[in-house]
């Protein structure tokens, strides 16, 4: 049976592996992407300094290495191993691929994996057999397994690899043969060992195996990860991967350099900064926007809804203008706060005409029972109000952002070099799909849109150069983009409260997520809770809704379910950006954020709605750019707390702690930001249906 298993095993089935501490000279803590679950197994490489639990990182010159499996939780913490995923054998294959590379590169003589048999899905022996085959086929005969250790312990499965031409007892870190277990007897054929309990003679390898197991049975996995260092960026990278991708050499090249572009801004403030701030903050621009919207709204309420006579249009228009202006007067017109206050005011205004609407609606009744008619009336009113609010927010999103579009049209992009301009034009034109697909691990050289790999490499290099040259937008500006995200990646985002963008991030200075490029279809998320609760359909802020007809497909493949996200991102002033102006499509008011960007999630709002067509799983996410200065790449955390409670606590005392952002704000499910309760209305106005793909790709 074992021979059959090894024949069926595919040696090339390795899984994606992420180095969770890229700062280490010797990579030694990894996550393994086994499936689309939000918790993934990982492993740490380490060594022991004595016969007890005292362990440390691998260093140059070490000869004995230990592999300790663990689970990487969705919160980014390390916990005791819960399982190896659906294919423990593929996990082991991936682990030993890394182990063999490490042993060869750093001249390590022995390596041991100890794993609880209860976590192997009944495949402990198969795992040992597979490891034996891997070592024999990949080491060129230089390494062998100590098979005498396989069946020593009922609780653990042991796998020990050692260099063939080195005696085990001579390797530093391998325990001496235990005098508690064995008596050494000299004989004519050499030393023999007698088991003190049974009196039976055993081979030297059997005595070594028993001594190794005796020492390691006392060790706890908990002690190994008490002082482990992990990278927030690497965790986010591993959790933002889709299961189907093409990890080419170029993908790996650019993945390894992405953090370079998430550093604090070095570019000078753009010349248009003051004009930009004035355009969205001046009373004149707000009055102009309020007047335009009020006139259009008054006419709509007269002609479409027949709420009042034509002679009252001007009076109603003035009233609407005053209501809007009073709501938004203290907020920048492109900010979420402004849109939120505007939405609340418009909602309240429309409610004043509910009796008028009901009078017209009740005239259409055709003898339905009161209970039935009441439900019909409720649904019809909600749909009518939803449709109205979405149109209103759509209008304000475009008109209030008018100054941003005018400024962008006038910008010439002359600060960039010819090659940088070429890269920007290629990205803003038709090349962004292939460029970002390569960075996302989706690019297939046999099926691409317009650019070959060589052309993409040139474009990315030119864009990277443009970011180094770069622009810096003023503080207090919110940029917007949309994204269609698979359910597993979204769930990791919710748990971890951080998201990693592998690709260049196309955003707009205008609130394009509320329908600027199409008919608004998701607009109720900015309302106060009571009003929003009436209009949303999911009734679920952060969770995912699985419709009955999707349950089977979701169980078979969680990536089947997509979540539509509207991003409102603050803090873009913290990093170098590219502001293309006339080098791109100026009416889009595009600002490109760098690849490798990390954002902290501050607020997730349910944006689902039904205005005649149901839109499930639509979310408004408010986030903030985090630079490498704010987000520590490697911090020491208390492993005891991580494993026992899931709480992330930085180590103190004699251990040097690097400057860092408070990680509790990333993992807490109760992250709160002071926002107006009307946020719900705006969220449901998110519309990404007809948006240019570069503002959605990710």
Swiss-Prot record:
- Reproduce the UniProt comment on modification after translation: Proteolytic cleavages at the N- and C-termini by the prohead core protein protease give rise to the mature enzyme.
Give the location in the cell. Answer: Virion
Q: Which residue positions hold the site described Cleavage? A: 7-8, 633-634
Keyword hit for Ribonucleoprotein: no
Which GO biological process annotations does it have?
A: regulation of viral transcription
One GO molecular-function entry: nucleotidyltransferase activity
Q: Which reaction does it catalyse?
A: L-arginyl-[protein] + NAD(+) = N(omega)-(ADP-D-ribosyl)-L-arginyl-[protein] + nicotinamide + H(+)
TR mART core domain residues: 375-628
Q: Where is the active site?
A: 481, 506, 590
Protein family: Belongs to the Tevenvirinae NAD(+)--arginine ADP-ribosyltransferase family.
Q: Which HAMAP family match?
A: ALT_T4
The name under which this protein is listed is NAD(+)--arginine ADP-ribosyltransferase
